[in-house]
């Protein structure tokens, strides 16, 4: 059962004894799922971002063209996690372009590079204050902590109070995900 892997918040009244992953899965899964388009950290958003070395393979290069061509509704934004001004600007630029193109959701992927939760909190709080529609469309925050959780434990409860968290490659040892 999950009790050997997940520890509930003290005083939450949650008990994982006798509970299994299947207990938390949707019984009648949807037939269709939205596709998430990854906006890489060096991907060109506008013509000003072009370097001249872009592929000439017939596929879009600029984000607005991708959105229009493929009807993108969900954008995963890769961030640096070490340059708050750049990360915030990237989220705003992608968010505005996405909203103009009918985006439903976006996510912020900090790529296991954040050294302190306040870094993410400050970006999220600024989005909430200055770009509330972009903040509202930010479905979750991915990897707001180091890859090696064992060696760089962070208390990210303050981040999860703002937005749900998603971890993938950091979750390679559940002993440290508590």
What do the PLM-derived regions correspond to, one by one?
Residues 92-100, 155-161, 178:
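Short, surface-exposed basic-aromatic patches at helix termini and helix-loop junctions that form
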Residues 75-83, 107-112, 135-149, 162-173, ...:
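Catalytic beta/alpha-barrel core
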Residues 1-132:
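N-terminal capping/lid subdomain adjacent to the active-site entrance of alpha/beta enzymes
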Residues 124, 142, 154-157:
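Generic hydrophobic alpha-helical scaffold/packing signal
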Residues 63-64, 153, 176-177:
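Generic hydrophobic/aromatic pocket-lining and core-packing "Φ" positions
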């Amino acid at each position: 059962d999950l009790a050997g892997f997940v520890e509930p918040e003290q005083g939450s009244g949650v008990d994982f004894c006798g509970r299994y992953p299947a207990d938390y899965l949707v019984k009648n899964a949807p037939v269709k799922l939205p596709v998430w388009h990854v906006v890489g950290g060096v991907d060109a958003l506008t013509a000003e971002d072009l370097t001249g070395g872009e592929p000439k393979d017939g596929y879009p290069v600029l984000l607005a063209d991708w959105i229009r061509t493929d009807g993108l509704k969900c954008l995963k934004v890769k961030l640096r996690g070490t340059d708050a001004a750049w990360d915030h600007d990237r989220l705003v630029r992608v968010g505005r372009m996405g909203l103009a193109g009918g985006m439903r959701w976006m996510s912020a992927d900090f790529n296991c590079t954040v050294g302190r939760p306040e870094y993410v909190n400050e970006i999220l709080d600024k989005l909430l204050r200055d770009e509330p529609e972009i903040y509202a469309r930010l479905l979750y925050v991915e990897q707001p902590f180091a890859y090696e959780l064992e060696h760089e434990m962070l208390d990210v409860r303050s981040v999860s109070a703002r937005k749900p968290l998603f971890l993938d490659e950091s979750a390679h040892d559940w002993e440290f995900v508590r």
